[in-house]
């Protein structure tokens, strides 16, 4: 079996050693080299031609983001960022994902050895997914305002329910940016750790006509608003309070190894919204959301899955399609328009 070749770049010798220990403990991957900074890494990339790079975001001699941007322009390769769990770390990590990084893992604030070893399976899963990921070309920065679509109508009854994982931060941005301010309410579960979703919501809010926020327990769901499940600690559910939709956040065990889980949100939407919802499953590894999307379809919702060609990782959509949960398979660039088209359809389903 061919092993996944990994190059670890981090200014901390402790982190380099721990990452090497963790990665080499899995039989399908190995660390071929480590580097204390991007300048050393540049030479090691030429020498070893690694399959995946793990990259610290803050390092001496060259900033991790600067190096990532140069790398994705000149020698694109799968990168998993290693970030500190701070507000600044969250903002930098989101920028790294925009620049083309596949995913990220966090350094624990205290007890770094125990924290990273506890993350062993997560780190290995992310490296495996990165090794199979479809790289996005880094487009030149554009300052033009995004083209806004027109909503066929505004209704407090209609809802869009979205789930995503690896590659999802950029996919979600691409879905939300064209939507008009009077779009129906949108609920999103993106696999993300605590401490990152608030920064992600703020970044999206600045880019989109719709209002984007991190969801709060018990809040009423309003048209023109996007509610992002908080990372790490709870599952997000859709419920009813009289004539209104409301959000529930529940601290319970992970589902499909994830918290928040897409399946939890989708199953709750099937029960609370039925045929008034549209379910969308985007890029991501694993199967979270597939069964929930099928439940939504059976409850009368329109459902769609992102197509393989536009996915960073075609895991969750593939599982949903295999179950027969997706009414249609749609390229990422067309999903916003398809959502609005479905909202305008007449019949027993949105």
Curated annotation (Swiss-Prot):
How is it modified post-translationally?
Phosphorylated by CheA. Phosphorylation of the N-terminal regulatory domain activates the methylesterase activity.
Q: Which UniProt keywords apply?
A: Chemotaxis, Cytoplasm, Hydrolase, Phosphoprotein
Q: Which GO terms describe its molecular function?
A: phosphorelay response regulator activity; protein-glutamate methylesterase activity; protein-glutamine glutaminase activity
Q: Which residues form the CheB-type methylesterase domain?
A: 152-346
Q: Which GO terms describe its biological process?
A: chemotaxis
> Catalysed reaction per UniProt?
[protein]-L-glutamate 5-O-methyl ester + H2O = L-glutamyl-[protein] + methanol + H(+); L-glutaminyl-[protein] + H2O = L-glutamyl-[protein] + NH4(+)
Q: What is its EC number?
A: 3.1.1.61, 3.5.1.44
Q: What's a Pfam family in this record?
A: Response_reg
Q: Does the keyword Lipoprotein apply?
A: no
Domain spans labelled Response regulatory: 5-122
| CDD domains reported in the protein's UniProt record | CheB_Rec, REC_CheB-like
The record ties this protein, via PROSITE patterns, to: CHEB (PS50122), RESPONSE_REGULATORY (PS50110)
Which InterPro entries is this protein grouped with? CheB-like, CheB_C, CheY-like_superfamily, Sig_transdc_resp-reg_Me-estase, Sig_transdc_resp-reg_receiver
Q: Spell out the family assignment given in the record's similarity comment.
A: Belongs to the CheB family.
Q: Know the name of this protein?
A: Protein-glutamate methylesterase/protein-glutamine glutaminase
């Amino acid at each position: 079996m061919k092993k996944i070749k990994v190059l670890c770049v981090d200014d901390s010798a402790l982190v380099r050693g721990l990452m090497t220990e963790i990665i080499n403990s899995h039989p399908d991957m190995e660390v071929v080299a480590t580097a204390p900074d991007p300048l050393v890494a540049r030479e090691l990339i030429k020498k070893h031609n690694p399959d995946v790079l793990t990259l610290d975001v803050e390092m001496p001699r060259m900033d991790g983001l600067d190096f990532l941007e140069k790398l994705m322009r000149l020698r694109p390769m799968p990168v998993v960022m290693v970030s500190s769990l701070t507000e600044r770390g969250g903002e930098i990590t989101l920028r790294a994902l925009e620049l083309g990084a596949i995913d990220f893992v966090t350094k624990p604030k205290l007890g770094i050895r125990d924290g990273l070893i506890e993350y062993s399976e997560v780190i290995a899963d992310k490296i495996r997914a990165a090794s199979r990921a479809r790289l996005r070309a880094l487009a030149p920065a554009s300052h033009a305002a995004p083209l806004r679509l027109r909503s066929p109508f505004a209704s407090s009854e209609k809802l869009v329910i979205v789930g995503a994982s690896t590659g999802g931060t950029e996919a979600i941005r691409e879905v939300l940016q064209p939507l008009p301010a009077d779009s129906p309410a949108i609920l999103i579960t993106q696999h993300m750790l605590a401490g990152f979703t608030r920064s992600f919501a703020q970044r999206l809010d600045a880019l989109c006509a719709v209002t984007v926020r991190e969801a709060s327990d018990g809040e009423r769901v309003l048209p023109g608003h996007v509610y992002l499940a908080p990372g790490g600690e709870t599952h997000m559910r859709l419920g009813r309070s009289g004539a209104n939709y409301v959000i529930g956040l529940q601290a319970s065990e992970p589902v499909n190894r994830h918290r928040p889980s897409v399946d939890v949100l989708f199953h709750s939407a099937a029960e609370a919204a039925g045929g008034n919802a549209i379910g969308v499953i985007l890029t991501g590894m694993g199967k979270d959301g597939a069964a929930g999307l099928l439940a939504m379809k059976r409850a009368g919702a329109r459902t769609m899955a992102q197509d393989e060609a536009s996915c960073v990782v075609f895991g969750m959509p593939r599982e949903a399609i295999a179950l027969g949960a997706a009414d249609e398979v749609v390229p990422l660039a067309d999903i916003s328009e398809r959502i609005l088209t479905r909202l305008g359809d007449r019949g027993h389903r949105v």
